[in-house]
Amino acid sequence: MSTYESLMVMIGFANLIGGIMTWVISLLTLLFMLRKKDTHPIYITVKEKCLHEDPPIKG
């Protein structure tokens, strides 16, 4: 096998591994986001900010 062919095989293999790793990381991120939905810092700050700016109307 020539140098060019071996280089192409290595690039293809790296591309395959990169694609698989991208899918794994995105699935893990999605699962983490779904599991930790209420404890996300941005979600909490937006919730608190809304409560401070617009207090609930009582009676």
UniProtKB/Swiss-Prot annotation:
A GO term from the CC aspect: plasma membrane
Transmembrane region(s): 7-27
Subcellular location: Cell membrane
The keyword Cell membrane belongs to this UniProt entry's keyword annotation: yes
Record's bilayer topology term: Single-pass membrane protein
Keywords noted in UniProt: Cell membrane, Membrane, Toxin-antitoxin system, Transmembrane, Transmembrane helix
Main location: membrane
Function: Toxic component of a type I toxin-antitoxin (TA) system. Overexpression of txpA causes cell lysis; the TxpA protein has been suggested to act on the cell membrane or might possibly block cell wall synthesis. Overexpression in E.coli is not toxic.
Name of the protein: Toxin TxpA
Species of the source: Bacillus subtilis (strain 168)
